[in-house]
Amino acid sequence: MKNVLALSLLLFSLSAAAQCDSVSEINVQIVELAKKKLGKKVDRGECWDLAKYVLDETGANWDGFLKFGMALKKGECVMPGDIIQFDKLKTVMVVNGLKTSESFPQHTAIVYEVKNADELVLIHQNTGYTGKKVGTSTFKFSTITTGKYTIYRPIAH
């Protein structure tokens, strides 16, 4: 039991990110563009399509593939408009006594809101919640059991 608790605390400390004191202009624009698409399908409805749309519309500097800007280091502050790329990530949580799990084999999402160091609200599409349409969902770093993620800070041209 002590080992499980120690591992959980280690995962949380490596995963949690601080909230930034301010939000960059390009990130504000990204959130506003994504918000206007709530309930709508962007392009093919793939998760990546929403990120591509907001980055292209803002004229952001990115590689057109999976490098959505500058990769943040663990522990750096996260702001709305940052883009998170999940890779083979799994989460497990207990809600009202029920154990639920979620898998993100390869998924792209935009940070919509930073609740605290552990909890984000994501805006994304191609999910189990909203299908191919843009919607929001909560993500907690403390629920990660396996896999990895990278958070990118969009860069203005």
Question: Residue locations for each model-derived region?
Answer:
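Bacterial Sec-dependent N-terminal signal peptides
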Residues: 1-21
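Compositionally biased, intrinsically disordered low-complexity regions
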Residues: 8, 61, 66, 71, ...
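Hydrophobic alpha-helical elements and their junctions with loops/disorder across both membrane
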Residues: 13-15, 41, 116
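N-terminal capping segments
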Residues: 19-70, 89, 99-104
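Aromatic- and glycine-rich peptidoglycan recognition patches
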Residues: 21, 25, 102-157
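...with weaker cross-activation on analogous glycine-rich loops/strands in unrelated enzymes
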Residues: 60-128
